């Protein structure tokens, strides 16, 4: 039975795990790392790079290196958060054909789902390489506070990557699964998950294999990227004050600054002070300029204090929704790379009044939880029941633009709820059902998930027709809505696709693009291997010809030189098949060279030289027996 893998598709890093021997195991990628940067780059020659290779060239190729795309997934281009993100990244965010936020790289426009799919493909290949078999199914994690559009876009990314997404699972819930799998004592825990781009807080009750989420809250635009941005802002302002040059206008300088900021932030988790040293960061008429700046942990904490405090408001709301106080929490589990920061731990400890639990690996625990959920779905993990919740209230727009809730936030999923509405005007023969998600009282202030029409309602006075609206949320947190006229039995239903979102045709096209990229990657790999083999053979043959050329006749020498020239021409051409063909031809001729060299050596060895001494002159060794007993 094929394995189902668990993937943590992170803003900054991604991780893949699988159940092995009843325990989740994190799989190392081709570079030997347990996590993979969620970065995709398009090189000048059209090559697509994913993970560490993409990160390494980001400084020299900022326009075409896409990172933190998870913050754009499922978002509209005109969303204020998208506008804010545009100011933070060196690459171009553009308006997609459906009004969603897309990115531009290598002269092409890509949806965030497509870019995420490239990272998922890398995770899929990592697992396949380890397992030695094809992987087609996965459980993928998302921030608990992701709305329906963001969840649907993540599922689309999985489909584009060639994966059937069996379940979308919330990151804090996944972390709780990994933390509490072998713990049977009843506990109320808080999972504080501060990652690269998002923040979640979930309150759970765990015990006897049951993981019940009581409440969840969060901020989908709060994470390590924002901490880095504060540092970049600080360094850029300091440099502008000293040199009068705005580094944020220079994409290359901005990328160098971002990398330096991230490095400084990480160093200050273990050191009290660090130095940022960026020579030749820019230049003006007076010559090159260098950025050299010392930074202390206290400086960093002062800069990011407002961001850390921003995480406490969702914590308060989650506790209130669960009907609990901070003192009622038995354990606070810290998840996400940013929880390594001493100040974050200090603030959490201060709020909950207890030392947070840091015994889980914050970068890997979510993927491990996803693998456990995969094991549950596959039947490998028994006696585990996961009860998650919907993070935001769902409802429809009613008369006067009011948001009428159908399903309240923190309702356990899957769930289904129906309510009956009527018409607003006499003889109204159609109604438009507009579906929203959020907590505001007016529909327009919430996130519109989609709309559809129920037509063919028989003429009647207002308030007479009976229209039953049903909301159905599946275990992935994805919404289906239907409306039925009770009088005629006519029904209309939609699986909510965000007012933007990707259509099935869009996804099919992107699947084909992903396959094309995978095929191109294979061709590039084959070409690189063929080139390496050909160049190695050329070098070896040239060396042998140089050392032993005097031992072969002119005809063979010319044949070898011609074969070397053909192989070099093929290498310059870059075609894998041509390089392989010419390398094979050169190998055949090289064998003749080796044969000729050996024949020459043997002939020289057999040539008459000095006469060997006769047997008569050979003297036998003389020896006498020694008796040890004497």
From Swiss-Prot:
Acidic residues bias spans: 617-630
Spans annotated as Disordered: 604-630
Keywords, ordered alphabetically: ATP-binding, Chaperone, Nucleotide-binding, Phosphoprotein, Stress response
Keyword Chaperone: yes
Cysteine pairs bridged by disulfides in the record: none
SUPFAM superfamilies: Actin-like ATPase domain, Heat shock protein 70kD (HSP70), C-terminal subdomain, Heat shock protein 70kD (HSP70), peptide-binding domain
GO molecular function: ATP binding; ATP-dependent protein folding chaperone; unfolded protein binding
Modification type Phosphothreonine: residues: 198
Record PROSITE patterns: HSP70_1, HSP70_2, HSP70_3
Top-level taxonomic group: Bacteria
Gene3D superfamilies in the cross-refs: 1.20.1270.10, 3.30.420.40, Actin, Chain A, domain 4, Substrate Binding Domain Of DNAk, Chain A, domain 1
Induction of expression: By stress conditions e.g. heat shock.
Pfam family, one: HSP70
Function description: Acts as a chaperone.
Family as reported in the entry's similarity comment: Belongs to the heat shock protein 70 family.
Name of this chain's protein: Chaperone protein DnaK
């Amino acid at each position: 039975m094929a394995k189902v893998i668990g993937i943590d598709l992170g803003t900054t890093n991604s991780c893949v795990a699988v159940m092995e021997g009843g325990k989740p195991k994190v799989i190392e990628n081709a570079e030997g790392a347990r996590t993979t940067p969620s970065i995709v780059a398009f090189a000048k020659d059209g090559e697509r790079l994913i993970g560490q290779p993409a990160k390494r060239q980001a400084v020299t190729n900022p326009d075409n290196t896409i990172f933190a795309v998870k913050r754009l997934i499922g978002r509209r281009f005109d969303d204020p958060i998208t506008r804010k993100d545009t100011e933070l990244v060196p690459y171009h965010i553009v308006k997609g054909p459906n009004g969603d936020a897309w990115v531009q790289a290598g002269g092409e426009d890509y949806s965030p789902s497509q870019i995420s799919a490239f990272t998922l493909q890398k995770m899929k290949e990592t697992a396949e390489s380890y397992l030695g078999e094809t992987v087609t199914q996965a459980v993928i994690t998302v921030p608990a506070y992701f709305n329906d559009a963001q969840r649907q876009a993540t599922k689309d990314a999985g489909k584009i990557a060639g994966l059937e997404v069996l379940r979308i699972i919330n990151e804090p819930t996944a972390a709780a699964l990994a933390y509490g799998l072998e713990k049977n004592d009843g506990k109320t825990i808080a999972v504080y998950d501060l990652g690269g781009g998002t923040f979640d807080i979930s309150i759970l009750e765990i015990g006897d294999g049951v993981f019940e989420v009581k409440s969840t809250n969060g901020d989908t635009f709060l994470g390590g990227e924002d901490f880095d941005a504060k540092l970049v802002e600080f360094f850029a302002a300091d440099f502008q004050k000293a040199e009068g040059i705005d580094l944020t206008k220079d994409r290359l300088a901005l990328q160098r600054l971002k990398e330096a900021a991230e490095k400084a932030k990480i160093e200050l988790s273990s050191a009290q002070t660090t130095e940022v040293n960026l020579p030749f960061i820019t230049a003006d008429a007076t010559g090159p300029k260098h950025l050299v700046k010392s930074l202390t942990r206290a400086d960093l904490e002062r800069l990011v204090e407002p961001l850390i405090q921003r995480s406490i408001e969702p914590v308060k709301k989650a506790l209130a929704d669960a009907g609990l106080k901070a003192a009622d929490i038995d354990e606070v589990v810290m998840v996400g790379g940013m929880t390594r920061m001493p100040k974050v731990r200090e603030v959490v400890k201060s709020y909950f009044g207890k030392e947070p639990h840091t015994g889980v690996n914050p970068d890997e625990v979510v993927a491990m939880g996803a693998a456990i959920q995969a094991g549950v779905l596959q039947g490998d993990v028994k006696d585990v029941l996961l009860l998650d919740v919907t993070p935001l209230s769902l409802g429809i727009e009613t008369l006067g633009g009011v948001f009428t809730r159908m399903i309240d936030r923190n309702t356990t999923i899957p769930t289904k709820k129906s309510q009956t509405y009527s018409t607003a005007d006499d003889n109204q023969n159609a109604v438009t059902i507009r579906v929203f998600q959020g907590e505001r009282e007016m529909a327009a202030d919430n996130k519109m998930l989609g709309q559809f029409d129920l037509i063919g309602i028989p003429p009647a006075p207002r308030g007479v027709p009976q229209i039953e609206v049903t909301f159905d949320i599946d275990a992935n947190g994805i919404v289906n809505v239907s409306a039925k006229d009770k009088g005629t039995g006519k029904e209309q239903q939609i699986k909510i696709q965000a007012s933007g979102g990707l259509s099935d045709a869009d996804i099919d096209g992107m699947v084909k693009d992903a396959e094309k990229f995978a095929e191109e990657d294979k061709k590039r790999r084959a070409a690189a291997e063929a080139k390496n083999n050909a160049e190695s053979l050329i070098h070896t043959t040239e060396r042998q010809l140089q050392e032993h050329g005097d031992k072969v006749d002119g005809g063979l020498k010319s044949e070898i030189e011609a074969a070397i020239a053909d192989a070099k021409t093929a290498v310059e051409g870059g075609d894998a098949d041509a390089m392989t063909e010419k390398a094979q031809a050169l190998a055949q001729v090289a064998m003749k060279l080796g044969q000729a060299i050996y024949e020459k050596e043997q002939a020289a060895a057999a040539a008459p030289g000095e006469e060997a001494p006769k047997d008569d002159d050979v003297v036998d060794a003389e020896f006498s027996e020694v008796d040890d007993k004497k």
